[in-house]
Each structure stands twice: as structure tokens, then as C-alpha cells.
């Protein structure tokens, strides 16, 4: 099945057509900067631009950096508060003229990894964590997604974990790999206590530098591996989600 995948992030909105049977992009992905402020109408205009540029008339899968319930966005920590309570799927259907499916961004990345990447064929409990502007999470039990976990907002030392251990926190506080890895390990220790994962997959752009920090994570019981899909995970996962939730007929 061919689906247009669109990945909405705090800094950029990326899109590409996806072959959902192979988990591959059919063309080079196109990125447009996320509008400032990132209000619904402004972001929707970029989504519509992607659909128009690809001359797309089929199904569209779209990620969102927040909790999504039945197409309605309930949180939007790294965008704009105007999103809260918005029927975002209806908005995107309207501006694109397409049938859209909306999914949490980390859940989308997790779906891609579980189907085509580091989690393929893995049973038991798998925890996918994406480190970027914040920390996204996706939890799977025997391959089944438990949606909208938002574990990046677990409190560590009086602050959201993503304020201490995200990639943005590393850059903002100019942390060495060792210092940052210590914060990540503390966070992962909390996640082990809460979810007892068999496998932890580390995603986000920083997963490309896994050799800099994964060897420093020495106190964890679970196996910790870098994501295989890397920056394509959101786009592929969005498209995969849309294909799995396409209307019958």
C-alpha cells in the first residue's frame, strides 16, 4: 500500500510517500520548518503544502507530538497550547481534501521499529524512547501498542525527564556525553522499574551517535539498542498507522 507519511516535529515537518509493505520511502523526504508560532492553522497549511507538492490523492498518515485520542489532540507540549482540544484529524482532512490518520509521533516511530526495525519479531515488553526536542515514548506488549504513554514527562529530581535528559537538554546545558549518559541512565532506570521492559530502543536523531553513549549505560537489566529506522521512523510509522486504520472498502 502506498501512503503519504507526514511527521510533525518541534522544528520541522517532514513528508514522503511510503511503501508500507516494505517500510521504505518512495522518494526523498521533503522538510519544511515548523511555523512559529506553531498554531493549528499554520501547521495545517504546511501539511496541505506537502500533500499538494506530492500531488497526493491517497491516504495520508500524520504524526503529532502529543497525546491523540480519536483524532483530537489532548496535549502539545512542544508546539502551541492552542492545539489542546482541537479535532486535528478533521482539520487536516479539511485542508488536504484527503483521508488522514493521526497518531502520536513516538507511537508512530515505535510502530515502524516494531514492523521493520530494531523491534521486528520481538515479543515481551518493548519500550521505544525518542530523544530530541523532548522525550517521546511508545510501549509494546507482544507487539501490541499501548498508545499515548508520554513517559518523557515522568518526574526526575523535581523536573520532567525530558527537561534533563532530552537531546535538547544536552545541547542547552552543554553536557558531555558522559554527563548526559548519566542522566539518561537514571531515567532509563526509572522506566525499568515502571515497565520492566525486555528491550529498550533508543530513537531520535541522536541514535545515529549511539556509540558515544550506549556503552556508558552499564546498570540496566534490559537490552538497549539504537533504532534502525532513524529519521525515517516517524514518516514510515505514520504511513503504517494509516494503512492499518484505513476505512474498509
Per-segment meaning from a language model:
Residues 1-60, 68-72, 92-98, 112-128, ...:
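ATP-binding/phosphotransfer module of carbohydrate and carboxylate kinases, centering on a glycine-rich
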Residues 100-105:
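General beta-strand structural signal in soluble alpha/beta enzymes
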